[in-house]
Amino acid sequence: MVREEVTISTRTLQWKCVESRVDSKRLYYGRFILSPLMKGQADTIGISMRRALLGEIEGTCITRAKFDKVTHEYSTIVGIEESVHEILMNLKEIVLRSNLYGTLDASICVRGPRSVTAQDIISPPSVEIVDTTQHIANLTEPIDLCIGLQIERDRGYRLKTPNNYQDGSYPIDTVFMPVRNANHSIHSYGNGTEKQEILFLEIWTNGSLTPKEALYEASRNLINLFIPFLHAEEQEILLEDSENISTVPLFTFHNELANLKKNKKGIALKCIFIDQLELPSRTYNCLKRSNIHTLFDLLSNSKEDLMRIEHFRVEDVKQILDILQKNFAMNLPKDFF
């Protein structure tokens, strides 16, 4: 466990991790402070951050399991202690770590008698099992158990539907949220009109990411939500009388991109994350693995630089060029190509 003394800054707004510990493979804890804040700001940030931590961060889970010769979810299999339903519930609890999108396939194929754990899951290299000791089933006889698994990355939760059973496979009620809990508290200090606040933020995660990583992801997601307003031109709305209703146009991401044509400052480009460029999942994952997270990062690379990225194709570069030209009237640096 790491614990640091809290020191109050009276000048620049800054955050700090004051406590960090690993309670188990599937329970990480972190406590952070942000200060100094004006009165009321701590509550505004704390509420928004808590909701973003619990609802906006993506996780990777097993979403479907396929058994051979199983008639329904509540069947029992000779030689296995658990019912099919209990095995599905155990698979639901498996904690995975992955940055890839789309549907991935995995499997379990073992022979008893033995205990089946998360370590027996055969998954793609891009998927990491956080706790390989998690129990799945106990085989009491020399039988074969083969289960086909489907892995997905998403946010929030997904409830299985009765008509979603296909080819002997069973959907799993899935909770994609990697943050188990988040709390915030406020400490006030100072006197009179100079009263200020410190925001304390506590984060518990399931081990697929650290509380610090969760804080970064939640902050980035909140920034993404507000970006459309950053460069929006002010609209003058004239209401002549109560019978005439003026409709305010929605500020879309593409409106904001058009405004960037007038403002190409680095600080603006650093606020645009590649998540917003609507790239195919394959291209997006290649860029993320190369630590290209923002538009500023992307524009810091030439075409040749992108082609050096593992698994990157000419078609991917052309697609990026089209997006940059269409939305930003920009191009990648040419002097290095």
Swiss-Prot record:
Looking at the keywords, is Nucleotide-binding present?
no
Similarity field: Belongs to the RNA polymerase alpha chain family.
UniProt entry keywords in alphabetical sequence: Chloroplast, DNA-directed RNA polymerase, Nucleotidyltransferase, Plastid, Transcription, Transferase
Which biological process terms from the Gene Ontology are attached to this UniProt entry? DNA-templated transcription
Q: What does this protein do?
A: DNA-dependent RNA polymerase catalyzes the transcription of DNA into RNA using the four ribonucleoside triphosphates as substrates.
- Region (Alpha N-terminal domain (alpha-NTD)) residue ranges read 1-233
What domain comment accompanies this record?
The N-terminal domain is essential for RNAP assembly and basal transcription, whereas the C-terminal domain is involved in interaction with transcriptional regulators and with upstream promoter elements.
State the name under which the record lists this protein.
DNA-directed RNA polymerase subunit alpha
- State the organism of origin: Ceratophyllum demersum
Q: Which InterPro entries match?
A: DNA-dir_RNA_pol_insert, DNA-dir_RNA_pol_RpoA/D/Rpb3, DNA-dir_RpoA, RBP11-like, RNAP_asu_C, RNApol_insert_sf
User: Which stretches of sequence are listed as region Alpha C-terminal domain (alpha-CTD)?
Assistant: 266-337
Q: Which GO terms describe its cellular component?
A: chloroplast; DNA-directed RNA polymerase complex; mitochondrion
EC main group:
transferase
Q: Which GO terms fall under molecular function for this chain's record? A: DNA binding; DNA-directed RNA polymerase activity; protein dimerization activity
Q: What is its EC number?
A: 2.7.7.6
Subcellular location per UniProt equals: Plastid, Chloroplast
Can you state which reaction this protein catalyses? RNA(n) + a ribonucleoside 5'-triphosphate = RNA(n+1) + diphosphate
Taxonomic superkingdom:
Eukaryota
* Summary of subunit composition and partner proteins: In plastids the minimal PEP RNA polymerase catalytic core is composed of four subunits: alpha, beta, beta', and beta''. When a (nuclear-encoded) sigma factor is associated with the core the holoenzyme is formed, which can initiate transcription.
